[in-house]
Amino acid sequence: MTSIRATTAVFAALVLITTSTGTAAASTDPHREAVQRQLTAAVASGAAGVQIRVTRDGRQFTARAGVAKLGSPQSVPLNGRFRVGSITKTFATTVTLQLVGEGRIGLDDPVSRHLPGLLPDGDRITVRNLLQHTSGLHNYTDDIPRDPKEFLPRRFDHHTALGTVRKAAAKPLLFPVGTKSSYSNTNFLVVQLLIEKVTGRSWRAEAHRRILGPLRLTDTEVPGDNPFILGPHARGYLVVEGKPVDVSALNPSMAGAAGEIISTTADLDRFHLALLEGRLLAPAQQAELTRTTAVSPGYGLGYFKMTSSCGITLWGHTGGIPGYLSVMLSSANGSHRLESSLTTGTALDQQVLTKVVDSAVCG
């Protein structure tokens, strides 16, 4: 990997693989043993450390492999904190859909209704287009330096959602609004601005008020400008001139509602189960969450689906931010769930990681 952009690119190519990184305690359970074997293989293929939480048919276990810090014998904390990257989008979508249910914003409202003048095409781009990645907006993370030597000295810079969106919106649309799908982090910075405009409070405050507080996600944080991961955590790395460099500390304001959240596998599992069980959204908005279209067949609203090798359809999100790859996936009924974090500074073997996912989901 060569930068935040490269991190995202690698993760996109390995969507399923991250799903299964973790280790299990010694056990005669064949499922746990299968997961452990694949975790060991993931570390052998380049991961510094991995942790995973797996739930299947009411039985749950946690597992890990590798180390929390290169050069140290310390194991990855089993419920250590990590940067979840784009899993943040599912949190932001949940807040937005709650506002839709309250009648404060509409999915088919044009952005210009709430944020006049922000986007040149704001009369045509709707809230739904943003959540579905069909807006055509330029992806601002494509402009982040590819070379980690350029990224490293900038990683503590402060960024505002408004400033970042304005720069991205100055570039031409990738396609006419609604005609195609293209993943763009810019969409969710606009979502952040919408949440703040409609509520009069920060996106951070709304996430705490609506999700983190009610669900008691005490190990989950919307950090803003705080560059540090508080509490036990594994270090994340980028490779610079062939050597891993610790990038655990960085200013997550560059990610905002597109990817700034810090959490744990336990908190992500609690959040995802609440979402699946309809405890966070009204039925109408719950249905919208997983509604796909011909233009965006694999992505609902801040939420995507994939199919495991054993035919189980999974919903959730993955995330990539410098130093960390993460995953949160579940079957529609919640019987099969997994949350995982992987720390690495190298490209990993896709087949190895795909096997990890399959071991966790299919066993």
Regions from the PLM with identified roles:
Residues 46, 71-129, 175-184, 256-259:
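Short active-site loop at a secondary-structure junction
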Residues 39, 58, 92, 96, ...:
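Residue-level preference for non-acidic, small/hydrophobic
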Residues 31, 35, 84, 88, ...:
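Hydrophobic (often cysteine-bearing) scaffold residues that line and stabilize catalytic clefts
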Residues 2-4, 25-64, 199, 245-363:
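Catalytic loop of the DD-peptidase/beta-lactamase superfamily, centered on the K-T-G motif
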Residues 57, 68-70, 135-136, 227, ...:
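Solvent-exposed coil/turn segments that connect beta secondary-structure elements
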Residues 122-314, 318:
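Short, surface-exposed loop or secondary-structure junction motifs
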